[in-house]
A protein has these predicted regions:
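A post-motif C-terminal structural segment
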Residues: 1-182
Length: 182
């Protein structure tokens, strides 16, 4: 059985927790539904373990944590880690009711060289207060605000040979603006 969020288009990935619309299911809600469906169908829908040993396996992946770390997006990584933690909480509630029949394994698959936010032996500051002001992921920014930023320059006249609407970085935008002001 594969549970798919009904609001996702085609095979799209879930959005980061920080970007998730109210209509989308959280990882915890998907975990809750999976447990209810798999356990509730046992033994004629009575939700009790039988002696035949029929059990079930659920894998819940907080895969967007890794995506956020690759993007160096601290708040998206933190938000999706908390989202995954909430899903684990749902599984733990099931465990509390069925401790002899339940095994929960939580592991990281390859997020071992991720980003560093501050370091104890340097003067680098983490600016956590600024992180709390972040309202969406870098991916959301890139897909939405950056496109609007580029569109604002689409009709700009510029002495350089660059088409401002094709720029893909703020550095390139700055260089274009500097060359236009010369």
């Amino acid at each position: 059985v594969i549970a798919i969020n009904p609001w996702l288009q085609n095979s799209a990935a879930m959005p980061y927790a920080i970007d998730r619309p109210e209509s989308n299911l959280s990882l915890a809600e998907m975990t809750e539904v999976a447990i209810a469906n798999l356990y509730g169908k046992k033994n004629g829908g009575k939700g009790k373990w039988n002696r035949r040993g029929d059990g079930f396996f659920i894998m819940v992946e907080g895969g967007k944590i890794d995506w956020a770390c690759h993007a160096n997006d601290a708040m998206a990584a933190i938000g999706d880690t908390l989202d995954f933690d909430n899903a684990i909480g749902v599984a733990l509630e099931f465990y509390k009711k069925h401790p002899r029949e339940t095994l929960i394994v939580v592991t990281g698959d390859h997020e071992t060289g991720g980003m560093t936010i501050g370091h104890a032996t340097t003067a680098y500051k983490a600016y956590y207060d600024r992180l709390l002001e972040q309202e969406n992921s870098f991916q959301y920014f890139n897909d939405n605000q950056w496109a609007a930023h580029k569109a604002a320059y689409a009709d700009a006249t510029c002495p350089s040979d660059h088409d401002p609407s094709t720029l893909e970085s703020n550095t390139a935008m700055l260089e274009l603006m500097e060359s236009a002001s010369v």
